């Protein structure tokens, strides 16, 4: 082979090794989950979080960073949102779902999780540490901005309901934090932040299932479901995403088909 032919072959090989061909598909996003025990993996055999099952219904990888006992405030103060921001890459998707542990008042026997009342820039002071505490909406907005700055898109998800049949009659009134996720989304006014009403999706499913079937999903208490209940909650979440219950989200295109319909 002539020297010129050899050099040409080597040059072509170098280009092929270093180029990023247009025909290669873009990197698939990873879904990160931020939440409390209703989303997190549990070591208790009587309960589990829905975040452990959602990967069954998606065609992308899922990283569940939810942890029990956390609120929007404590997840922020403990640096857990920052940890997720350090992990995400541009194009990844993050679901943020809190509310169960945000109740109470920092002004009265503050437990480090309660948020200040209000839906904006209101503040209050912890009666135990002197910490300035902010509202649920404030913490959600700060977390969303942090993650958006890293190139991730954010889905603000309303908290799952408790057992709405616990009294034997249907009680579907949502927690005050359910509409606050939408408030935060609207305040951000960012196309990269969307909202899904997970609470409403699960509520519709519970109405359809009835008191006996729903009661069987709550073994430990009326907040945490069994593994079977967590799986159903994940299916309700995916159905809401796929059917664009509250508009489109970047996760919709990564839902496996056919979609299981649970409500």
Placement of each model-derived feature along the sequence:
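Short, solvent-exposed loop/turn segments at secondary-structure boundaries
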Residues: 43-46, 75-76, 167-172
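Acidic helix-start/capping segments at beta-turn-to-alpha-helix junctions
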Residues: 67-72, 164
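Alpha-helical cap/lid subdomain in secreted, periplasmic
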Residues: 83-227, 231, 238-250
């Amino acid at each position: 082979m002539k020297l010129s032919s050899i050099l040409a072959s080597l040059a072509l090989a170098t280009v092929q090794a270093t180029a990023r061909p247009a025909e290669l598909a873009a990197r698939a996003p990873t879904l990160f989950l931020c939440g409390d025990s209703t989303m997190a993996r549990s070591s208790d055999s009587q309960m589990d979080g829905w975040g452990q099952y959602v990967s069954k219904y998606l065609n992308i990888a899922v990283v569940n960073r939810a942890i029990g006992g956390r609120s929007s405030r404590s997840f922020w103060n403990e640096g857990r949102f920052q940890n997720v921001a350090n992990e995400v890459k541009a194009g990844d998707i993050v679901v943020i779902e809190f509310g169960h542990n945000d109740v109470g008042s920092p002004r009265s026997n503050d437990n480090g999780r309660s948020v200040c009342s209000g839906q904006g820039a209101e503040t209050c002071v912890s009666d135990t540490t002197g910490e300035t505490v902010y509202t649920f909406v404030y913490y959600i907005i700060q977390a969303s901005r942090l993650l958006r700055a890293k190139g991730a898109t954010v889905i603000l998800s309303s908290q799952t309901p408790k057992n709405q049949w616990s009294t034997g009659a249907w009680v579907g009134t949502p927690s005050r934090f359910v509409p606050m996720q939408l408030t935060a989304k609207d305040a951000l006014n960012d196309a990269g932040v969307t909202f899904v009403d997970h609470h409403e999706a699960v509520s519709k499913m519970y109405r359809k299932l009835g008191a006996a079937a729903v009661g069987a999903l709550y073994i430990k208490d009326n907040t945490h479901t069994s593994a079977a209940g967590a799986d159903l909650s994940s299916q309700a979440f995916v159905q809401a995403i796929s059917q664009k219950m509250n508009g489109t989200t970047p996760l919709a295109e990564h839902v496996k088909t056919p979609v299981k319909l649970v409500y």
